[in-house]
Every structure is written in structure tokens, then in C-alpha cells.
């Protein structure tokens, strides 16, 4: 696998196991700076498992183990010396369903900063506003910062979760089907936001929607039965895929 000088992260020879079950087979994949990569494939193909390897969320599963390398800025994130808390700050994650804390809007965004020892009120206020602006949510909640985040709409809650991830200044943003639980208008806002965020972040998104992958990503990677079948520029993947399995999946012949 060729790793370019623009690579922010890469996986090389990655194997992942749940106990004796091998869920990922020899994955080689590079993520370049300021690009959006969509991971596609049918349910159970390994795309979400792979995504969770990128910030070691799978460490939370006792029977799991990893072989191979995942590197961030050239450093193996599975090296025993790696601070996993710091890794998850650098590689943030937004989940499928909005998961705001039962706290105020302000405290949801400030949470990660407080965990990292930030106490200065002025700095917290500045970072909360900046993060909400980056998540295209500030104008909708600026007068509701002390209200419960649970009172926001589903789309607003998901953008709040994005703001919460952005507040701790990540370098990579992982998104696991971030719009699957949202209506079309809220989905459009998330997709517009992804286009803006890629100017500052490297984004890796799992999606079941071929249309969404085509709209938001620069690169698409197709997974099937735990293997990376094909990867390439999204426009080419959706119009001239090299692999017959890729073509069959994208055209809806199986899923």
C-alpha cells in the first residue's frame, strides 16, 4: 500500500477479531488530510467495526483484538505507549443516534473541555460559541444555552454532538451514520456541514445511503464480508467501478 505525504491516517494489514471470529481481513486504507471518505457496504460488512478501530472504541469490547497497524500522523495508535484518552480527543466520534447528555446546551459542549481541566469561564464561553458556530447551530441555540439539550430537535441534537466533538479540537472526525435517524431537512444540514468541516478536519463517515456517499465524499471505500473490496475517488467509484461486486452493490443488486 502506498501511503502519500498527505496521509493523515492509514490502516495497513489490519485484522480485527471478536474472540475467534475474524471480522476484518487485511485492510489497507489511507485517509488524506481535509478529505471526506465514505465507508459503504451492506449491514454486517465490517465498516462500523473498522471505523471504531480508528479511535480504539473497540478496546471497550473485552474479547476483541487487533493485528496490523493504524497510524495517525505516522504513529501507530495501537502502540502500548499511546494515551487513549488523548487519541480520542484527536480522533473524535459522532454516533448514529444523537446522544446529548442530560445537561444544558452549554454544558454539553463544555463537557470535554472541563474533563481536560479547563476552568476559565471566559475561555469556556469562547470555545462553546466557536464550536456551536462551526456546527452551524449557534444562531438556533444562542438564546437557549442554559436550557436542557434534550429539548432540542433530533437534527439540532446531532449538530450539538458534532459541536461537542469539535470543542476539544480534534484533527479527525469519525461519523457513524450521523443522519440515519434524521428527517430529510436535518440530513441536508448535516451534509452541508460536512462540506464546511472538511476545510479543517479529515472526515470518515459510515453511511448506508449511496446518495449521501455520492454527495458528501471525495473518496469511497466499499466493504463486503469484512474485506475492503475497492476504494477510489467517489465520482469514479459511482460511475466506473472496477469490481463487479462494487457495481452490483452501488446499483442495488444486493444490499
UniProtKB/Swiss-Prot annotation:
Disulfide bonding pattern of the chain: none
UniProt main location, coarse: membrane
Entries under PROSITE patterns matching the protein: ABC_TRANSPORTER_1 (PS00211), ABC_TRANSPORTER_2 (PS50893), PSTB (PS51238)
Chain residues that bind ATP: 41-48
Domain ABC transporter: 9-250
EC nos: 7.3.2.1
Keywords: ATP-binding, Cell inner membrane, Cell membrane, Membrane, Nucleotide-binding, Phosphate transport, Translocase, Transport
Membrane topology term: Peripheral membrane protein
Subcellular location: Cell inner membrane
SUPFAM superfamilies: P-loop containing nucleoside triphosphate hydrolases (SSF52540)
Enzyme class: translocase
Database matches in Pfam families: ABC_tran
GO molecular function, one term: ATPase-coupled phosphate ion transmembrane transporter activity
Listed InterPro entries: AAA+_ATPase, ABC_transporter-like_ATP-bd, ABC_transporter-like_CS, P-loop_NTPase, PstB-like
GO biological process, one term: phosphate ion transmembrane transport
Self-association and partners: The complex is composed of two ATP-binding proteins (PstB), two transmembrane proteins (PstC and PstA) and a solute-binding protein (PstS).
Family to which the UniProt record says this protein belongs: Belongs to the ABC transporter superfamily. Phosphate importer (TC 3.A.1.7) family.
Annotated function: Part of the ABC transporter complex PstSACB involved in phosphate import. Responsible for energy coupling to the transport system.
Descriptive protein name: Phosphate import ATP-binding protein PstB
Gene (UniProt): pstB
